[in-house]
Structures are given as C-alpha cells and as structure tokens.
Amino acid sequence: MRDPRVRVRFCPSPTGAPHLGLVRTALFNWVFARKHGGGFIFRIEDTDATRNREESCSQLIDTLKWLGLDWDEGPDKGGQFGPYYQSQRGDIYQEVLDKLLAADLAYESFSTKEEIEKRNLEAGRPIQLGYDNYDRTLSEQTKAAMREAGRTPIIRLRMDDENIAFEDLVKGEVVFTDPIPDFALTRASGEPLYTLVNPVDDAFMKITHVLRGEDLLSSTPRQIALYKALITIGITDYVPFFGHLPIVMGEGNRKLSKRNPESDFYFYKARGFIREGLLNYLSLLGWSISNSRDTFSLSEMIHAFDVRDVRGNPARFDYKKCLAINAYHLRELNVEDFFLRLVPFVEEMLGIPLSFEQKNSLRAICPFVQGRVQLLTEAAEMVRFLLVDNISVDFAVTDKEIDVLRHCLALLNLLDTWESAQIASCIKQAIEQFDLQPKRIFSILRLAITGRRVSPPLFESMQILGRSASLNRVETFVTN
C-alpha cells in the first residue's frame, strides 16, 4: 500500500570504507521507501570527530550514487529538515538538551567512571551494571561545588523503572525487562552522543520507520525512552516503528563486520561486480522474492517487498552464490551496456585508454564473452589477447601437432575471406588429414591465438583479431 507519509533514513558514520552490511541496510530502506512512495533520507552521522574521515564521507555518497539508490533529502540535495550532517546540527541538539533539563527529564551528572565503580563495589553491585543513578538528586549547592572544583558534568536522561516493549517489524514483540540506568546524552565536553543525536534527528526529520541492523537492537529501549521524552517536550508526537535486520555472517560463521576484507564494498566493485548483481544478492541476505527464485530486478523487488517478510535469523554471505547471481545479471545486460561497463576495466588492466580501433574490436568480441564470465575483471582478462601486440605461450606439443598447425597455416593463407565459418572449415579440413583429436588441436590453437585455455569461441576470436595477427601468432607458436 502506498503511503507518501512513510519516511526512512540511512545514517552511516564516516569511519571507514562502506561494508556490505551497511549497503544491505541502505538497500532495504530505499526499497521500503520506493514501495510506499515515501521518502528516503540520507544523513551523515559525523559527530565523533576522533573517528570521522572525510574520505569515508565521499565514499558513502559515491557508493549510493553508483548503486542507483537515490535519496530524496540529504547531502548534495538538501531538504526542509537539513542540514544533513550531524556536525552541523549542534544548535538543534543544545536546544533539545535545554528543554529536557528544564522539564527535569534529564539532569547533570558529575560522577566519574572510577567513582561509579567504587560505589558499585561498596554496595555489592556488579560493576558491569554501570551507572547507579547517584546524581539524580544532587542539590544545586553540590553541583556548584563540583563546578568550583573544576569538574564538568555530562547530561543523563532519567529512565523510568519499567519494562520497555515494542513490536519489531522483523522480530515481532521484543521486551526489555532488565533495568536500564540513566544514560549519557553528552560527553563532559558538551559534545552530544549518538544516544541523543540519532533519535533527535529522526524526530526532527519526521522519520516513521527505523530499519537497521540487529546489532543496534540493544540501543532501542534507550531510544524509545528518549522519544517519549521528546514527545513530552513537544519535539515530536510519536515513536517510529523499528525493524531490525538480521546479522550477516561471513566465513567461519563469524559476523561480517567492517573489519573483514570480504565485507569491503569497494572490493566487490573493483572486482567487476555490477550494481544489479550485487543488489540482487544483498537483498537475499534476510529476504527472498519467492522460494523458487533467486534472481530478479530492483523494480521487481520494490513490487514484492514487505519488511514483515524479512527473516529474523542470521544470514550467511555466500561468495560463490554472489558470483553466480552477478553472472546472471551480466548476461541480462544488452551487449552495448556490457561493452560500456567493460571498457574501464580493460583500460585499467592495460594502463592506457583504448583507441578507436581497439574499442571496435572489444565491442565485436563482447557478445562472445558476456555469457562466459562472472565478473567484469574476468571479461577484461579474457579479451586481453585482442588488444596487445604479443602474448606469452608456454605449452609443450608433439612434432605431429606442429605438422598439423603448419598445414592449418598453409590452408588459412589461401582463404579469400577471413570469417569465422571459413576459418573453422579450413582448420577442420587440415585436421582431417591427420590422425589426431580435433579437440586437442583446437586447444593448441586457442593457446596460440589467445594465450588462454578458456577464451571466447576460437574461430570468432580469430576473425575479430584479424588475418595478419592470427597467422603471425600461429607462426610464432610453431617456430618457437
């Protein structure tokens, strides 16, 4: 059902290269927004100055653009609820903090980590329980004395002593029964923490649905508590719906985190995965279009997607399956699109721009390569023979096989037209005069022409390479 009031957000921190789990989260949010005709908001959570990297910020923007996950509000686009970099929203956070303090929903806390641990030990309370709400009732006189002594407070939110429950769009009912201590909203420097800025930005930007990784589930009760406080002070009038997407597991059944090389988005882009294949596979990490079908387009996903169909169990990343799905989408491209996407990989491989003639040769070979590869880098290696002057071949052959090749050369030199059908007929005719398996001779010729055991079809490769280059390569192979 379409509902333009739906607003979701993708709000990564620019602390490293984008990883696949992050891209999967962006995809599910984008599809959810497009399904409902709502808004997809892109926000950069760059409040932690010690970890932020400008390069990472650019990579996040470039990643979404390359994937075609366009945003309705955010960096490079703006919107009525900006700015969309948290580092530029400090005045908003301070205004909210002032209102929370004035309403006695938050308070100043001066306790140090060491003081909290000491009190817990003296009270026989486990240290891991953390803060003990000690500063809730500090008098103004005590606070003044603390400041006089040079101590700077942090701001904490008052938590009610009650269970927090909500209906998760993926996991169903979730209930938190353990008491949650009053948690920090700021550092002692006054810098706002994630616990404050994330829900505040969602409230100001009128986010209706929060779809994010399951690793953030534990922070949800604190955010719900803050939302209720924001309702009290008039910042918003609702708590958004939450849906926690399953964890993605990698090799060895370990969580696929940003520290794993196999999770780096740029690894897949550089290897020649295409956006259609990568998005298709990432959508399968927690969701499927049907029990009998794994491949589909982005538009088909939008039509079929229901967040309540997302599975709650951990999803396992399978590189081989990702390759197979990418191969399917490579085959689905029209030939010209395949050619255009292949050109940058070929130029990077060769280290030089392709000439007009080289591009024509590449375009001609593409129909014979497209169905044989899983990655654009594989395709680039497969067509290298067309675009270089010399190839290296080290392969042992018998004297009889050399005789066959010489006979092939003699007949090929007599051809009037250099076309694949005539080339094939000529070579087969030469082989028939010798008691050898055609497959073996074809393999030798393939190596002589392309330098590879796996290549585009032999006779079409020879036609596109051209008479002179093809005959020279066979001659070189025979004489060396």
UniProtKB/Swiss-Prot annotation:
Pfam families tied to this protein: Anticodon_2, tRNA-synt_1c
Xref: InterPro entries: aa-tRNA-synth_I_cd-bd (IPR045462), aa-tRNA-synth_I_codon-bd_sub2 (IPR020751), aa_tRNA-synth_I_cd-bd_sf (IPR008925), Glu-tRNA-ligase_bac/mito (IPR004527), Glu-tRNA-synth_I_codon-bd_sub1 (IPR020752), Glu/Gln-tRNA-synth (IPR000924), Glu/Gln-tRNA-synth_Ib_cat-dom (IPR020058), Glu_tRNA_lig_a-bdl (IPR020061)
Gene Ontology biological process terms from the UniProt entry: glutamyl-tRNA aminoacylation
SUPFAM superfamilies according to UniProt: An anticodon-binding domain of class I aminoacyl-tRNA synthetases, Nucleotidylyl transferase
Motif ('KMSKS' region): 255-259
GO cellular component terms, A-Z: cytosol
Enzyme class: ligase
Entry binding sites for ATP: K258
Motif 'HIGH' region per record, residues: 12-22
Compartments in which it is found: Cytoplasm
Main location: cytoplasm
Catalyzed reactions: tRNA(Glu) + L-glutamate + ATP = L-glutamyl-tRNA(Glu) + AMP + diphosphate
Record keywords: Aminoacyl-tRNA synthetase, ATP-binding, Cytoplasm, Ligase, Nucleotide-binding, Protein biosynthesis
Enzyme Commission identifier(s): 6.1.1.17
Molecular function in Gene Ontology: ATP binding; glutamate-tRNA ligase activity; tRNA binding; zinc ion binding
Family of the protein in this entry: Belongs to the class-I aminoacyl-tRNA synthetase family. Glutamate--tRNA ligase type 1 subfamily.
Subunit note: Monomer.
Function summary: Catalyzes the attachment of glutamate to tRNA(Glu) in a two-step reaction: glutamate is first activated by ATP to form Glu-AMP and then transferred to the acceptor end of tRNA(Glu).
The protein's name: Glutamate--tRNA ligase
Organism expressing this protein natively: Tropheryma whipplei (strain Twist) (Whipple's bacillus)
